[in-house]
């Protein structure tokens, strides 16, 4: 089965400011679930200017305690891998992330893009699609997917609120035209 979450947001800030804010977003006291984010690889293609980054995020295990009675869910934290491709020239950044924990039982993938808005070149559009599919937990599959869907939606909205707050703090009021 699986569940999908789609998010679309326009930040009324220029692309470069939004991307810089995204890359510095975590850890953040507004989201205690993200413990750390570490860049493990970064390289620039000199011919195209494309910047590739691979980061590993360590997050708290947010699975409810009652479900952690199942041994496979009883882990202290969850690791996510994020890869991004930033083109300052084209003013877009593509991001792919997936869960490194529970890979034999679950698949969690997100694909995101930050790009210059077609509405206004001083704004930035954010589009994200996330999909979670649980396969190895028997009768718990449906329960875990429902929980994951709710958590993903809330997490996406929280991430947008954090971005808006950080952008306002670091760059001032949004560019309204």
UniProtKB/Swiss-Prot annotation:
Cross-referenced InterPro entries, in alphabetical order? Answer: PRELI/MSF1_dom, Slowmo/Ups
Species of the source: Mus musculus
May I have one GO cellular component term? mitochondrial intermembrane space
What's this protein's name?
Answer: PRELI domain-containing protein 2
Where is each PRELI/MSF1 domain found? 1-175
